[in-house]
């Protein structure tokens, strides 16, 4: 009984001392990024944590790029200008 209690105490202590290697540690406290040797599928490296480890973050947590907003129907207006250019070319050449 004493041996079983000693084994359980040792296992409880070891789980506190040995870090979990599968999950990785957090790189920065306010981002959902983890310090790993290799990034998982669906992740990208933000920066190198040290010489052999990267700070990996999921693509879903990356900020979306700001794209310019098109006003109105851009493709329709472009098509009309192309038609006008063709009409002007035919009238000039004939």
UniProtKB/Swiss-Prot annotation:
Major site of localization recorded for this protein: secreted
Keyword 4Fe-4S applies: no
Location in or out of the cell: Secreted
SS bonds (residue pairs): 27-55, 39-56
Biased composition (Basic residues): 76-86
Highest taxon of source: Eukaryota
Keywords: Antibiotic, Antimicrobial, Defensin, Disulfide bond, Secreted, Signal
Protein function: Has antibacterial activity.
Designated name of the protein: Beta-defensin 132
